[in-house]
Amino acid sequence: QNQGVDIRTAAKVASINLKGSCVAGVTLENGECVTTPLVISNADPVTTFTNLLGLQNMETGMARRVSQIRNNSGTAKIHLALNGLPQFTRLTDEQLGHRLIIAPDMNYIERAFNPIKYQECCSAPVLDISISSVNDPTLTSPGKHVLSALVQYAPYSPIGGWHQHKQAFTDVVIDRISQYAPGLRTQIVASELCTPADLEQNYGMTGGQWHHGELAMDQVLMMRPFPGCSQYASAVDGLYLCGAGAHPGGGVMGLAGSNAAAEVIKRGKKA
């Protein structure tokens, strides 16, 4: 803000506006129009081009490439509010501040993945666990902790719907963690399982794909998100991508955003 930036929250964008083939601004859901010749989107590419820009405003070949982006997700996330620090077997309290992976071997990973091919939930998921309150005590009250885990693999829409499977799958995840942290279940104050469908609904990620596009060989490096849009600038003058759907992808490294900013500066674009 000291640099003249106006930061606005709760200002959801409804559409990207064009003047000819150039960006002219955005329209917010409340009907307000913000005029600008430069839009840098952190939304996933499908949301950006399909929902906000509109495929009808793109060249046919480019629109086809957008429609072919694969956003299938097999990732859920669980959050556990705990009344104490869980005790993982043979791990020190200091080690609990690191990333904990439950994936004993390749066969385990394959067995965890196989059910999703049939829209079923696995019985022994791969888990990527973090207890963020170990490193940041301000997240909770003294003595309390928060455990979060990425859960691989969970179908977007299991047979029968998530309303039939959500609690059972939550129990599967908790039981699996408890095998490594005995007594965990007695420490749980509250739990939340975010399915791929929840991630899509709550965070606007197409398909619940938290990488904004599958990390497959034909969707990474110079192919991300697709040929003709791999250098952050799109075919629409003034529209750029800066999120996980752009090279080199997501995570907490921020490189896609840094690279997009460098590209905007190189092209001499100004809002």
Where are these regions (language model features)?
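A glycine-rich dinucleotide-binding beta-alpha-beta segment and adjacent secondary-structure elements
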Residues: 103, 121-130, 183-247
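Short glycine/proline-enriched loop/turn "hinge" motifs that connect secondary-structure elements
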Residues: 137-144, 230-234
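Active-site-proximal substrate-binding core of FAD-dependent oxidoreductases
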Residues: 18, 194, 265-271
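Mid-domain catalytic core of redox enzymes
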Residues: 5, 11-140
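Amphipathic alpha-helix from the class-I
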Residues: 152-160
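Structured binding elements
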Residues: 177
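A conserved FAD-binding loop/helix module that cradles the flavin
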Residues: 244-265
